[in-house]
Amino acid sequence: MNAFQKKEISLDERQAKSTAWALTFADVVTLLLTFFVLLLVMLSDAENRLSTLIENLLDETYEEMTTGLAYDNISVDRETKGIKITITGNLFKSTSAEVDPKYYEVIHQIGKLIAKSDLMNIEELVEHKALLETFEQNGVSLNVEVRCEGHTDDAKLPPNSNYPSNWELSAARSLNLVRLMNKHAGMPEKYFSALGYGEFRPVIDVAKIDNFDEKQEARAKNRRVEIYLDAFFENIIQKQEKIEIDIKT
């Protein structure tokens, strides 16, 4: 009887030992889940802080540009996608993508204001380095972008034009403006991008205007260049994959 009891105890012990790993495994899984939840909360908090920081820096830059770009043919607006600087008037000669030299000073001023802004130099601000490093360690980078968008009116180009359509003309104009800004601002080219929309995103729909003078005035407003200053988060791995795809294509 005693031998039988010892055998039963021995089986119980073996069963207990055989399931002991499950309890340890469950504890490890619980700890890992807790760690990842805590990490997500910390990243979310850091992202909110950085988003608030970016918005504050954009607000400051907007105020500086509003004061520093007090020209009749330039408007500065604070939008959800950053700061928009709109240049109208005879920035370019008719059917040409060359910037009129009389606007060089204005472009120089725009470039310098952007280059000196805290947003453009955020990585050099000591008080924000720890926050940026937290993101970089988790595979996320902050990108600052200066995007130039060219727009023309709906008038057809003459047969002897250097450009087949307003699309190409608007793209060439925005690219030339970007080059000038890059030259005057002294910033790396990686911050800049140029787009051309032709006549397809007008401020005023001239098709609804019958009066000739009013139509010409509307077309003058549609001929414009918009410069956007913005910042956004980007996954470093996805960014690298995108660069590799662009290189291959």
Residue ranges and their predicted role:
Residues 1-88:
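Short terminal targeting/anchoring segments
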Residues 60, 64, 68, 109-121, ...:
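Structured segments of extracytoplasmic/periplasmic soluble domains
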Residues 70-72, 79-83, 87-90, 95, ...:
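Envelope-exposed proteins and targeting segments
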Residues 99-101, 128-249:
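Periplasmic OmpA-like peptidoglycan-binding domain that tethers envelope proteins to the cell wall
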